[in-house]
């Protein structure tokens, strides 16, 4: 697997780790001007789905994700609904991500005039941005912050263990 999809996989694992122990009540609390955690989950899922499932196939973003796209109004979806979108987006995009090579990363989508490698880096950064936001909201709600990033025994390919 190419290093960029591996980096996104690590980003997803950290995103998931910041959701551990979250209740529906806490996930739906909104501390303005931020969105609530459940909206953020669905918002990040929207990007994963769009970038790596729908757009490479030449389709518009799945309608279930559109309420959480860039610029969409704030809402407070149930945690389970947001998590279902997140799990589905990750599962459905894994096939593309696991097979992505230099040629696939160079492909330009018809919906966004950047290549998929650039969108992948954008998605990694976006996921980390919202991971930090979720961590901040959790702390404001009285939760303990997640410990420093877990690399899950990952090392850059080519480096000796």
Regions found by a protein language model. Name each.
Residues 71-107, 114-129:
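Acidic/histidine-rich alpha-helical segments that form the ligand environment
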Residues 1-2:
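N-terminal leader segment of winged-helix/HTH proteins
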Residues 5-9, 16, 24-69, 110-161:
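Short, contiguous alpha-helical
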Residues 23, 97-101, 138:
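A structural signal for long alpha-helical coiled-coils and helix-turn connectors
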